Amino acid sequence: MKKLVSSVILALILFGFSWVSPAFAGDAGNGSKVFSANCNACHLGGKNVVNAAKTLNKSDLEKYAMLDLEAIKTQVTNGKGAMPAFGKRLTPDQIEDVATYVLEKAEKGW
């Protein structure tokens, strides 16, 4: 009986952890600095001066399947359309940090 109770408690604990949202991997504080130095010209305040319909707001990131750390890292690294690639200008850690920053700001509404 004791073993059964222990197993049930362990299962509940593990199940509870599965509902916790994952933390972003990068350093948003450093990402803010990277964003200011490299992204602000086009994306000040989460906007987009090239294509006003594709902002960094949560709703637009969701609409274009970009509300995802890996998707943002890929676009920052490789560029897309009018957005230049930053893969040779930024380190992988800087790209991770700026992607984390963008996601955190999008979640908070810029």
Curated annotation (Swiss-Prot):
Post-translational modification remark: Binds 1 heme c group covalently per subunit.
Signal peptide segment: 1-25
UniProt feature coiled coil, ranges: none
Gene Ontology cellular component annotations, sorted alphabetically: plasma membrane-derived thylakoid lumen
Compartment list: Cellular thylakoid lumen
Subunit structure: Monomer.
Protein residues bound to heme c: C39, C42, H43, M83
Family in the record: Belongs to the cytochrome c family. PetJ subfamily.
HAMAP family: Cytc_PetJ
One MF term in the entry's GO annotations: electron transfer activity
Alphabetized InterPro entries for the sequence: Cyt_c-like_dom, Cyt_c-like_dom_sf, Cyt_C6, Cyt_C_IC
Pfam families assigned to the protein according to its UniProt record, in alphabetical order: Cytochrome_CBB3
Keyword Glycoprotein attributed: no
Annotated protein name in UniProt: Cytochrome c6
Function text: Functions as an electron carrier between membrane-bound cytochrome b6-f and photosystem I in oxygenic photosynthesis.
Main location: other
Superkingdom in the source lineage: Bacteria
Provenance organism: Gloeothece citriformis (strain PCC 7424) (Cyanothece sp. (strain PCC 7424))
